[in-house]
Design a protein with these regions (language model features):
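Long amphipathic alpha-helical segments
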Residues: 43-45, 49-168
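C-terminal, charge/polar-rich interaction regions
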Residues: 7, 24, 42-44
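Short, contiguous strand/loop micro-motifs
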Residues: 21-22, 38-39, 81, 180-183
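Hydrophobic structural patches
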Residues: 24-25, 52
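Short acidic, hydrophobic short linear motifs in intrinsically disordered regions
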Residues: 28-40
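C-terminal regulatory/effector modules of DNA-binding transcriptional regulators
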Residues: 142, 159-308
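Short alpha-helical segments that sit at the start of domains
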Residues: 1-22, 84-85
Length: 308
């Protein structure tokens, strides 16, 4: 009698396969072939080969040709990242890579995290922005010169872009719109991070950039015209998020945005992140003043749940 074995091929997520491969390669200093990885992970060879190519393209694994066989290794900096994700550990590794000027390592660390089952907003609030703050603190203490500071801050903008282009939106929110604008150069990273965070949460999100040098007696008209063009035909909740360390630009931008209330089809809210010194100025024209990005996002999410 012939016995027929039936095989059920399960579908794996990238995160599942990546974890299995990382776990196995961590203990294989001399590397493993695709066949060995398939055996040790209990994933069929065709599937493991496909995912190894994906992880190689992402910069998480590397291969070395030995005869006719590809031997696979973990890329530098990936082997000792803990799963589930330890955000403090990743933050420290990212800061170390950035301060050492190791751009590729910094990107690999972020990519490894972003392609895991993680809270994408926390990657920004608990990993990326603390790294930006560290650069600022080191510069304030005289431990970085102007050129190095510029290089590192530019690298951090690229890191934020890396998060942006790897965002996975589980569900797009209906009638949820945000616009982030910076009123000073030192707030561009948190402003852009806000736009990326809202995008990750399913909002229709815009980032204008730093407009401090654009502010003049007629810029309010220019900004209001832009908001009308982008949101004029839309409905729902509209949140203008303002980030500035300058009292003048903070007042100007918040009052300009507030003047748009009643002129749009949706419900307009003004939010700002401000230090205690600027709290009073921020409160004049804002519906909410947050202490950090996470509290701002949480407030906006609550507003959306109320108005939708």
């Amino acid at each position: 009698m012939q016995i027929v074995k039936s095989f059920v091929y399960r579908r794996y997520t990238l995160d599942e396969v990546k974890r299995k491969i990382v776990d196995v390669l961590q203990g294989a200093s001399t590397g493993l072939s695709g066949i060995e990885l398939a055996d040790r992970t209990d994933i069929n060879r065709m599937t493991i080969t496909k995912y190894l190519d994906v992880l190689h393209a992402m910069g998480l694994v590397k291969k070395k040709k030995t005869g006719n066989v590809n031997v696979w290794f973990l890329e530098t900096g990936i082997a000792d990242i803990e799963f589930p994700i330890n955000y403090v550990q990743v933050q420290q590794k990212l800061i170390s890579a950035i301060l050492a000027g190791e751009e590729e390592l910094a990107r690999r660390i972020l990519l490894s995290v972003l392609n895991s089952d993680i809270d994408q907003v926390r990657v920004l609030t608990d990993v990326v922005l603390p790294a930006v703050n560290t650069v600022g603190e080191l510069y304030s203490r005289g431990r970085l010169d102007k050129t190095e500071r510029s290089f590192l801050l530019n690298l951090m903008m690229e890191i934020i872009d890396l998060v942006k282009f790897n965002v996975r939106v589980s569900e797009q929110k209906a009638n949820a719109h945000t616009l982030a604008v910076a009123g000073s150069d030192d707030k561009v990273h948190v402003a852009k991070s806000a736009a990326v965070a809202f995008s990750a949460l399913g909002w229709d999100s815009l980032y204008i950039g730093d407009v401090e040098d654009q502010i003049d007696p007629f810029f309010d008209i220019d900004l209001q015209r832009y908001i009308s063009r982008m949101w004029g035909s839309k409905h729902g909740l509209m949140v203008v998020c303002i980030f500035s360390s300058g009292e003048g630009s903070l007042r100007f931008l918040s009052s300009t945005a507030k003047a748009m209330k009643g002129r749009l089809r949706g419900e307009l809210r003004i939010a700002a992140i401000a230090t205690p010194e600027l709290q009073a100025a921020a409160e004049e024209n804002s519906d909410h003043v947050a202490k950090d990005l996470l509290s701002l996002v949480q407030w906006a999410e609550r507003q959306y749940s109320i108005t939708k």
